[in-house]
């Protein structure tokens, strides 16, 4: 990781590099995933089994777990872990329940009735990685808002461990979050099974949750067959800091995201050159104590940078251009600047609100737009799991008042059958 001075060029060269990373695709992976999807579409459970044997070496003896069996895993985990999951679930629930919307209806004096009906999706599938990349927090972040939205059935798919059993921590989180069924299957074949349905695995309306490049590609290819949350790219953190920030905190926060993936980006924008140098020294000191230091170092080498800016306005302008997944404002008066942030997945205010707080515990969702898509996408929310229908009721008298306007608009567009639909009612 190097230190550079913002000059209107160097920072935007970095932006171009990150945009190029976001657009990279591997045709071989796309081809392989397409084959898997078509295989599952045609072959159902047997195809899922064949792909599981091919990629994982074997098929677990028990594949399906109902609600009672899921809840049994609460007795298999560390009580302290269980307690932490329950507390996190409560925080996530408290935040997301404020997002819930109600159906509404309005009746005018004329007798016209209009409104919007809001209800949860029928069935949602959650993909949760297993093995070394097992994330119980992902279960909570995906299942809790779905539950609040009124989703009728929440299905979770997760690959088994090497022993053929599910990860107990993931299953315990599923119990706390209210997951209805779990199927021990992973990879692109699991995503395809959720999208099309098999003899055993039911078809869902939406697929959410993180996964490797094969899972992400499958979700992207199946969008339209089912809805998806988003196509997630590598993790990102951008920190804007002034001279009041703590270099040891900044170094730790940058590394907390860089450890996710060699393609993760970790960028610090600061108005203090001395803070930039101290942060670099802190990285060198702290990285030696971390398990994933090789991943962190590769991420820093390829997609990490410390940029010294003239002022916070310049830093925030660049932040809005980058539209990062995670944005930390480690400045003296962070609330003063929140109104200047237009594009960010989640914003962490001050020196005592580090990004991992949002990943696990605070309440806001950690499923966030990446690769600059925070310009137009939003975090996963209760709204992600509902559908809305509008309804209209007109009386004969009110339609008669509007008929000439409607017919004129339809005829102007050349849609005479539309106009006729109104006309015949008054002949």
How should each PLM-predicted stretch be described?
Residues 208-210, 230-241, 257-280, 296-307, ...:
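Short loop-to-beta-strand entry elements in the cores of soluble alpha/beta enzymes
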